[in-house]
Amino acid sequence: MMLSTEGREGFVVKVRGLPWSCSADEVMRFFSDCKIQNGTSGIRFIYTREGRPSGEAFVELESEEEVKLALKKDRETMGHRYVEVFKSNSVEMDWVLKHTGPNSPDTANDGFVRLRGLPFGCSKEEIVQFFSGLEIVPNGMTLPVDFQGRSTGEAFVQFASQEIAEKALKKHKERIGHRYIEIFKSSRAEVRTHYDPPRKLMAMQRPGPYDRPGAGRGYNSIGRGAGFERMRRGAYGGGYGGYDDYGGYNDGYGFGSDRFGRDLNYCFSGMSDHRYGDGGSSFQSTTGHCVHMRGLPYRATENDIYNFFSPLNPMRVHIEIGPDGRVTGEADVEFATHEDAVAAMAKDKANMQHRYVELFLNSTAGTSGGAYDHSYVELFLNSTAGASGGAYGSQMMGGMGLSNQSSYGGPASQQLSGGYGGGYGGQSSMSGYDQVLQENSSDYQSNLA
């Protein structure tokens, strides 16, 4: 007898958003109206490479009717968490369970470990000394850097065998200098992901003060700041080799440029012509005044986004679609003016349905769709409205407060939104962010009047 398509693929749902401490019994209670195949044995949790819960699980049910009942539990709460429920199948479940977790083929036999908490400026020689007596393969060490070319405090090391890597893991919480070093299992795939630049910040980083035209490093072609050049040429010139390309290190303990087959054309694709997001993004601004959204509910529609920004009236909404044809939870929203884009930032961290949404300003006053660059700022307004003399003044900030910045005030060409006076004056957190945005927006409009 031929099995139906559903029978061959099984009766499976995927659950996302589970509390980290969630047990199989709690999942059973959540789906108490559904018949789970083989009880708790039909609940298959997904784990990270380090063996920690990922907050996701597959649940095998007894029939298609039970699947329909389970899907009705979508967006119900477990504790204080909203839980999402999706239809899945046994093929997806088997593949995911095989390729995730600490014992997956991607992690089990390649001898990689990841170090975290390295002292600032830690060299490869110090890491080799830390693992004295354990054989590291040639071209088997890398120290990732951020979008400004600074050390992230992490390192990836590949040992000659998985057995040696297991010995290396026993040095967890030992010291280099005064710092305790954390060591985790890793894989070549994880190392490869660290060669992708931070997507949103790097894709549209404002040029640094030394990147103005004629400074020897133009930004008209791909718009990268000095940090990109440091990353490309190698922030660790000494030791066992620096970067000779974005694909890796040239010799010694750095990864060879052919190890992962990466190149600058791939890593920096989609970084010019006002294209936002990944190199494959098709969105192109016509006004140059945009806000990027992240964390959207996966079922959010364009109308939901228009309503989110009400009473502002966006000109256009572009919901990002990934290469697999699914929404990414991100979108670009285009406004008619810089002032509207700034005012829209007051909605940063506001909720859409059950999700809070992060906003990133991508607009500069006085520019239009043909301008050469837009600021892409994460969690920090970095607009230069009214700036004069060609100075950018404001610095790229991550999501970590003001980074010991004691004052953001100064000359008009260097103040936030150019000439509002005052400044942040030692503020070390993001409290009051919405209020500052709203005040700046209204002040700017009154100044124009």
From Swiss-Prot:
Keyword Nucleus: yes
Dimethylated arginine modification, residue list: 233
Sites bearing Phosphotyrosine, chain numbering: 246
Placement of Sequence repeats on the sequence: 234-249, 354-372, 374-392, 418-433
Modified residues (N-acetylmethionine): 1-2
Main location group: nucleus
Phosphoserine, modified sites: 23, 54, 63, 90, 310
Positions of crosslink type Glycyl lysine isopeptide (Lys-Gly) (interchain with G-Cter in SUMO2): 35, 87, 98
PROSITE patterns registered for this protein in UniProt: RRM
Subcellular location(s) of the protein: Nucleus, Nucleoplasm
Modified residues (Omega-N-methylarginine): 233
Ranges of residues in domain RRM: 11-90, 111-188, 289-364
Tissue expression pattern: Expressed ubiquitously.
Region annotated 2 X 19 AA perfect repeats, chain positions: 354-392
InterPro entries associated with the record: ESRP, Nucleotide-bd_a/b_plait_sf, RBD_domain_sf, RRM_dom, Znf_CHHC
One Pfam family here: RRM_1
Gene Ontology CC annotations of this record: cytosol; membrane; nucleoplasm; nucleus; ribonucleoprotein complex
SMART domains according to UniProt: RRM
An example molecular function term from Gene Ontology annotations: RNA binding
Entry keywords, A to Z: Acetylation, Disease variant, Intellectual disability, Isopeptide bond, Methylation, Nucleus, Phosphoprotein, Repeat, Ribonucleoprotein, RNA-binding, Ubl conjugation
SUPFAM superfamilies noted in UniProt: RNA-binding domain, RBD
Gene Ontology BP annotations: regulation of RNA splicing
Disease cited in the entry: Intellectual developmental disorder, X-linked, syndromic, Bain type: A form of intellectual disability, a disorder characterized by significantly below average general intellectual functioning associated with impairments in adaptive behavior and manifested during the developmental period. MRXSB patients manifest developmental delay, intellectual disability, autism, hypotonia, seizures, and dysmorphic facial features. Only females are affected.
Function comment: This protein is a component of the heterogeneous nuclear ribonucleoprotein (hnRNP) complexes which provide the substrate for the processing events that pre-mRNAs undergo before becoming functional, translatable mRNAs in the cytoplasm. Binds poly(RG).
Subunit comment: Component of a ribonucleoprotein complex containing mRNAs and RNA-binding proteins including DDX5, HNRNPH2 and SRSF1 as well as splicing regulator ARVCF. Interacts with TXNL4/DIM1.
Descriptive protein name: Heterogeneous nuclear ribonucleoprotein H2
